[in-house]
Amino acid sequence: MSNFTAEDKAAITSLWGKVNVEDAGGETLGRLLVVYPWTQRFFDSFGSLSSPSAIMGNPKVKAHGVKVLTSLGEAIKNLDDLKGTFDQLSELHCDKLHVDPENFRLLGNVLVTVLAILHGKEFTPEVQASRQKMVAGVASALGSRYH
């Protein structure tokens, strides 16, 4: 089931085609760890996360950010089945990693902020509304195992 209109899908896919996953991924995960420092506990193996500059310059943060945004790219290809797309990741984050599902919402909001910064005037209110709908859908799909 999908709550995305044709206009939503067009806005989401159009902007995503312009996203540099390497730049946006590291920036998004880095900002999540800086703005919401309690999320750092899930990344103990990443080395130094002792300051904003250490986090933003950490190659493991950047690499994992790319992995996260690559998964989001898959979601964009499957907007009508976000739950199915993220079923295995939901299971991993719930059963093995024990990540609070609220963190998925926070990550989505940080991503929207990063995309707004990177895409400036192209990131219109309509694009933002569609993107917010998408990250909310992804957060719900990732949190589905918790329900």
From Swiss-Prot:
In-chain residues carrying the UniProt-annotated modification Phosphoserine: S45, S51, S53, S140
GO annotation, biological process: hydrogen peroxide catabolic process
Record flagged with keyword Transport: yes
Amino acids binding heme b: H64, H93
MF term (GO), any: metal ion binding
UniProt entry tagged with the keyword Phosphoprotein: yes
Record-annotated Globin domain positions: 3-147
Pfam families: Globin
Tissues expressing the protein: Red blood cells.
Subunit field text: Heterotetramer of two alpha chains and two gamma chains in fetal hemoglobin (Hb F).
PROSITE patterns, per database record: GLOBIN (PS01033)
Function: Gamma chains make up the fetal hemoglobin F, in combination with alpha chains.
Modified residues (S-nitrosocysteine): C94
InterPro entries: Globin (IPR000971), Globin-like_sf (IPR009050), Globin/Proto (IPR012292), Hemoglobin_b (IPR002337), Hemoglobin_oxygen_transport (IPR050056)
Modified residues (Phosphothreonine): T13
PANTHER family in UniProt: HEMOGLOBIN FAMILY MEMBER, HEMOGLOBIN SUBUNIT GAMMA-1
Keywords: Acetylation, Heme, Iron, Metal-binding, Oxygen transport, Phosphoprotein, S-nitrosylation, Transport
Family under the similarity heading: Belongs to the globin family.
GO cellular component annotations of the record: blood microparticle; haptoglobin-hemoglobin complex; hemoglobin complex
Signal peptide interval: none
Disulfide bonds: none
In-chain residues carrying the UniProt-annotated modification N6-acetyllysine: K60, K83
The gene coding this protein: HBG1
Protein name as catalogued: Hemoglobin subunit gamma-1
